[in-house]
Amino acid sequence: EEEHEDEEHEEHDHGGLILAEYEQEDASFSGYEFEIGTSFDFDMGQLTLTYSRDQTNASLDSGPRVPRLAPARDTFSVDGSISGFDTRLSYQRVSDQSKVAPSEEPTDGYDMLNLSITRTFALGASELDVTVFGRNLLDEVARRHTSYVKEEAPLPGRNLGVKLYYRL
């Protein structure tokens, strides 16, 4: 069969991007999530301890696993409001995801440690929040199993910064 430039085709130019078509299929999901915590009041402020966990399993009714399913996660956090400082320390353990669909690769788990400390200053009728933060303090190479581009674009490495927020 001959092809001519002036003939119309089913194909369209997508600007070099991959065209993907997704179809829905029946699936069965099971899982759970929970969170427990407690707070303590002190003369200088308050402290809250929290633990949460979530896990999901799913398979297509035709047999294989549902793709890009989030792995189990455990999160521990400490929130405090002490002597005018609001502090949050959180640690999250994301498990390996080895229960994968036929078309995907397993993803390694990772540990994520984040910290933020905020102080609010009154400026007349306005307020200024100054936050010092650290994200991924362990500098882990972390990939989200749910991402289509997990291999090309891991989560950011260690990130330290200062954030200012001014309220009129």
Regions found by a protein language model. Give the residues of each.
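Gram-negative outer-membrane beta-barrel transporters
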Residues: 4-99, 138-141, 165
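Short, well-ordered amphipathic alpha-helices
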Residues: 33-38, 114-120
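A structural signal for short secondary-structure junctions
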Residues: 81, 108-111, 123-126
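Short, surface-exposed loop/helix-turn segments at secondary-structure junctions
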Residues: 101-107
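C-terminal beta-signal and adjacent terminal beta-strands/loops
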Residues: 119-168
